[in-house]
Amino acid sequence: MIYQVREIYMAFELHKYSLKLIKHPYWNIKCIGINHFQAMNFVHGQKYIKPYMTSKNVILRSNAYIAHLYLTTEPLDALVDYPVPLSRVNMYKVIDVLYMKHDTIPKNIANWLEAKNDTIVILGLKIMVFYNYTAASEKIVFLLDHEQIRVREEAILSIGELFLIDAEEALHNQFDKEEKLLKIEILKSLAVIGSDTSVSFITNVLKRKHLDKDVKMELLRSLKSIDNQYYDTRFILDLEIDRMKAHLNCAYL
């Protein structure tokens, strides 16, 4: 269907109109023309898009780069060296390009986790989850010590999504190093991959005093997911935990 539409697009010389938009002095009009070429899969238009891939305007540069990825026949392996930070929206656009083009996972995807650009590291993790790629599990676990919180967060999420059971102990060790947000994300991943070891870990943490209530609730939710029978029979004399369990057991409370 797209090929028929493109033939009509070219037959009526609408690509020339799109090119006029790309050459327009205003960046927002340029973006419309670029999006035309992308939507029509107008491969011959790449040469007009490429100059804007280095534009100082972030939005124009982003639109040009995504259109280039969509139109190119080259693999996305080179993206590992992309120097400019990607927004979350553009990360999902890249994944959408992979989906729409039915591309295979980049051959060097494991190297993306070592990229200097943190957003490429995050994108690499998202792509691994998209393809259910588990061959780089050690590198994913290594990212739990990354200096950037967004990278650590994505690594924690990926461990749960990819069901990396070998990362269970690493998540236990990371728990006390993180602030509230990532503590909760760790517990969500443990709810997926956790074993009896995590039951013991969570039980010990629940015995601590002065726990944040949201973290405490997530501890119980994770425990319930891993071993529901154990969850039902423990902490029955702790009034606060008992109230929280009642809330978890009944969504209407």
Language-model features: locations:
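Amphipathic alpha-helical scaffolding segments comprising HEAT/armadillo-like alpha-solenoid repeats
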Residues: 2, 9-22, 42-53, 73-83, ...
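Structural detector for internal amphipathic alpha-helices that build alpha-solenoid repeat scaffolds
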Residues: 2-9, 31-41, 62-73, 81, ...
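Structured extramembrane domains adjacent to transmembrane segments
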Residues: 20-48, 53, 57-62
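Short inter-helical turns and helix N-cap capping residues of alpha-solenoid HEAT/ARM repeat scaffolds
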Residues: 25-26, 56-60, 86-90, 116-118, ...
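Terminal, low-structured helical/coil segments at or just beyond the last alpha-helical repeat
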Residues: 232-253
